[in-house]
Regions:
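A structural detector for beta-sheet-dominated domains
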Residues: 44, 61, 77-79, 110, ...
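Short, solvent-exposed coil/turn segments at beta-strand boundaries
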Residues: 34-39, 62-67, 89-96, 147-156, ...
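Sterically constrained small-residue positions within well-ordered secondary structures
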Residues: 51, 149-151, 161, 244, ...
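A non-catalytic, helix-rich entry segment at domain boundaries
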Residues: 2-94, 98-106, 115
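A broad structural signal for short, well-ordered beta-strand segments within beta-sheet-rich domains
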Residues: 18, 40-42, 188-191, 230, ...
Length: 368
């Protein structure tokens, strides 16, 4: 225990301000509408008494704002997986983190890291034991997606994409929830992430390379594959092409609920350092394509008032005008070693490079 506490005491980073009141979006101040919190992410958890309980007080950062010390206490194992080796935080969606227990192998959805959820009564929703399809695995998870803001909603469907062919769905609010497991045949989806399209009411997966989009309709038990055609691709300089060729490419599919638009983001990242066998990567280039219903992916440097948020959580879009600190026509990206803002019009890059324990951007939460 003393060794764990000693390691934790060295991990807390940065200066912060202390606050018990979180600022609300000016864009939702009307009394006729619910208030909305600004997008944020967890920076760390500050070790607190009683130390033997291994609890920490959350330190968060609202996007483009200072860090804030909260009074909310969380189990440190949610942030420091490598120290405690009890649970693995495998993804997040709508402010809920998904964890996989090393003791019982159960996947749980928890709101502990959501600064706007209950301080005294955190929720932990266990899902049924995972079922592994033949020639598949359920130990390594690509990401988790939810069809609504809470797994307690009656119609909420949770999708878990595993590395490899398996895609699994569950309705946690049912009296006897169970998994619906699908084996994906096309290998271009094996390492891809799943997202939920509110516009279509279906889960979608972007294939590696960004040329195919798979859609799964759970109600009619159907799926379809759409091939994308890239258009309006700009002519790039030789230097830029060489830079892109030296990078790893990450594709993201994200939908704007307010405008109904769907975007494909190609993010080019390069390893800048190897630390204890782990690659620290930096965003070198980024391209945004707007998708239409005909399968066209049109390159654009103008997404208007929108901001695209990318992290290890499910991606989302917001209107910048609803939150004064946001930059319109930009992309925000948070990873384990990088926090970067890219303004698309003039490709202005604002970058922070430091470790992030929980690189899960939390979208705005509705509060009373």
């Amino acid at each position: 225990m003393s060794l764990i506490l000693n390691r934790l005491s060295k991990l807390w980073l940065g200066k912060s301000r202390r606050s018990t009141l979180l600022l609300l979006s000016n864009g939702f101040s009307s009394c006729s509408r619910k208030k909305q919190t600004p997008p944020c992410f967890v920076v760390s958890a500050e070790l607190c008494e009683p130390y033997e309980a291994c609890l920490g007080k959350l330190v968060i950062s609202e996007v483009h704002n200072d860090m804030i010390n909260l009074e909310k206490k969380v189990h440190l194992e949610l942030l420091y997986n490598d120290i405690f080796d009890k649970v693995v935080t495998i993804g997040a969606s709508n402010g809920w983190v998904a964890t996989l227990s090393g003791d019982d192998g159960i996947l749980r959805l928890q709101d502990d890291l959501n600064p706007y959820a209950s301080y005294t009564d955190p929720k932990s929703i266990p899902l049924p034991p995972l079922v592994t399809l033949p020639c598949c695995q359920t130990q390594i998870v690509t990401n988790v997606s939810m069809s609504s803001s809470s797994p307690e909603d009656e119609d909420c469907v949770v999708a878990v994409k595993f590395l490899g062919p398996q895609l699994s769905f569950c309705r946690p609010a049912q009296s006897k929830p169970e998994w619906t497991n699908i084996r994906i045949e096309n290998s271009c989806f094996f390492s891809s992430r799943v997202m939920f399209s509110k516009k279509e009411g279906m889960f979608r997966i972007l294939g590696a390379g960004g040329h195919l989009v798979g859609t799964w309709d759970l109600q009619n038990h159907k799926h379809k594959i759409q091939r994308l055609r890239f258009k309006n691709i700009p002519e790039l300089t030789k230097t830029t092409n060489e830079l892109m060729d030296s990078c790893c490419t990450y594709e993201h599919l994200v939908e704007s609920v307010t405008t109904g638009e769907t975007f494909l983001v190609k993010q080019y990242k390069k390893t800048v350092e190897i630390d204890d066998g782990v690659a620290k990567m930096r965003t070198e280039y980024l391209m945004v394509f707007k998708l239409d219903g005909e399968g066209n992916a049109v390159h654009t440097e103008d997404i208007g008032d929108l901001v695209i948020f990318l992290s290890m959580s499910e991606p989302f879009c917001l209107r910048a005008s609803s939150f004064p600190v946001l930059f319109p026509n930009s992309v925000e990206s948070l990873d384990y070693w990088e926090n970067v803002t890219v303004e698309l019009a003039d490709y202005l890059v604002i970058r922070g490079f430091r470790p992030f324990l929980a690189p899960y951007l939390i979208p705005p939460q509705h509060i009373d």
